[in-house]
């Protein structure tokens, strides 16, 4: 048995989960928020109870030290020697990383170089890695990339119709994201279906504030809705998803905004927030629609119709699907959104049960037993995938 920490470091946050492996028992989990501010928040779950502390955590190194101290103070580990490995979520692995990898100096340099492709995320992920290296330098650490799962996409899926030299010189192509989540839920779907994943064609719908759809054939990603960045694809909470690229200079001309300002609008003020004018949260928007708000209705219609585009496209690509999976915050918890996405898909063999669909945050088949295409709700677990990869690559006994 070995204890493994799964880490997701943001620019001002640190999410953690400690596992006993290989049993995959969660020993504790928590979150450090507002790092760098005087009123940082440290939350940890001990014996099923949340402990919350507001204190000054100036940087990630202090957050890591505090986390490790809490583990021993609360008796979750007797000593730090019990920690056998650390897994770090890294958003962008580019074309360099098609799998998770043991972190060494070369890997760190590669992640840094790839920061060009994910300027908001990779630098923060690096800070988390370095903070742990300072405190636990001899513990094996593994980088788990959001993009790695999608490295199996064929050129026909990942190339943009741009001058080929842009791809060769600048790495401009579709990378895709949420890979760890799509991998987890498709592998779990194969288990639930009782069939080898190699025999399955699956549609994975990761619907949260960020959202992406993936076509997974034989356990391999063959296409996904996000692109060079997580801005592409379906309509999201605050992100536009796909738009006509010529709109960017047009908006600049009309508003006097810089390209950076327009891109910021596309990332932070568009999507459901842009369409409604008041919220990126689907629960608020559904409530407003029930009150008769027209823009709420239109926003929800746009959200669903963009998902339909990918379901239709990927079903054609795979010549049919065996199952559609719903995961992430909205996919796991919104029966209304699932129902709207599935309505009218009988032509492709989808027959879902409204009663079975009334589930929230738990695994369930929501299709009728006779439905040729199975519909499954699967709560995602990116942290356990990270822990599994640490166990696989870290030579941990």
Curated annotation (Swiss-Prot):
Homodimer. It is an enzyme of class 2 (transferase). Substrate binds at residue 89. ATP binds at residues 15, 206-210, 281-283, 329-333. Keywords: ATP-binding, Cytoplasm, Kinase, Magnesium, Metal-binding, Nucleotide-binding, Transferase. One of its GO terms (cellular component) is cytoplasm. Catalyzes the formation of acetyl phosphate from acetate and ATP. Can also catalyze the reverse reaction. GO terms for biological process: acetate metabolic process; acetyl-CoA biosynthetic process. This is Acetate kinase. SUPFAM superfamilies: Actin-like ATPase domain. Its cofactor is Mg(2+); Mn(2+). Mg(2+) binds at residues 8, 382. GO terms for molecular function: acetate kinase activity; ATP binding; magnesium ion binding. Belongs to the acetokinase family. Pfam families: Acetate_kinase. The active site is at 146 (proton donor/acceptor).
């Amino acid at each position: 048995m070995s204890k493994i920490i799964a880490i997701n470091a943001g620019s001002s946050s640190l999410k953690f989960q400690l596992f006993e492996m290989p049993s995959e028992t969660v020993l504790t989990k928590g979150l450090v928020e507002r790092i760098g501010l005087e009123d940082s928040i440290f939350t940890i779950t001990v014996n099923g109870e949340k402990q919350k502390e507001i204190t000054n955590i100036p940087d990630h190194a202090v957050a890591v030290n505090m986390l490790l101290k809490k583990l021993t103070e609360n008796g979750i580990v007797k000593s730090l020697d019990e920690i056998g490995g650390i897994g770090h979520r890294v958003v962008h692995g580019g074309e360099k990383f098609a799998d998770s990898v043991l972190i060494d100096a070369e890997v760190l340099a590669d992640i840094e170089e790839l920061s060009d492709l994910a300027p908001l995320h990779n630098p923060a992920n690096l800070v988390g890695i370095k903070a742990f290296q300072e405190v636990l330098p001899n513990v094996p650490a593994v980088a788990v990339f959001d993009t790695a799962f999608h490295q199996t996409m064929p050129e026909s899926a990942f190339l943009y119709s741009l001058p080929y030299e842009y791809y060769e010189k600048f790495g401009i192509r579709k990378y895709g994201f949420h890979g760890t989540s799509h991998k987890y839920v498709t592998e779990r779907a194969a288990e639930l279906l009782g069939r080898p994943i190699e025999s399955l064609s699956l549609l994975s719908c990761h619907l949260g504030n960020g959202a992406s759809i993936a076509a997974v054939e034989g356990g391999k990603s063959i296409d996904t809705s996000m692109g060079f960045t997580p801005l592409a694809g379906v309509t999201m909470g605050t992100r536009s998803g796909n738009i006509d690229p010529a709109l960017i200079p047009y908006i600049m001309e009309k508003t006097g905004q810089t390209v950076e300002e327009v891109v910021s609008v596309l990332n932070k003020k568009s999507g459901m927030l842009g369409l409604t004018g008041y919220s990126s949260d689907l629960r608020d928007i559904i409530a407003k629609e029930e009150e008769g708000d027209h823009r709420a209705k239109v926003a929800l219609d746009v959200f669903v119709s963009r998902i339909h585009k990918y379901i239709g496209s990927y079903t054609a690509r795979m010549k049919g699907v065996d199952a559609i999976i719903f995961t992430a915050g909205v996919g796991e918890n919104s029966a209304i959104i699932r129902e709207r996405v599935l309505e009218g898909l009988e032509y492709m063999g989808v027959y879902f049960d409204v009663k079975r669909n009334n589930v929230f945050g738990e695994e369930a088949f929501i299709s009728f037993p006779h439905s040729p295409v199975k519909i499954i709700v699967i709560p995602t677990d990116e942290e356990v995938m990270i822990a599994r990869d640490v166990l696989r690559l870290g030579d941990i006994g």
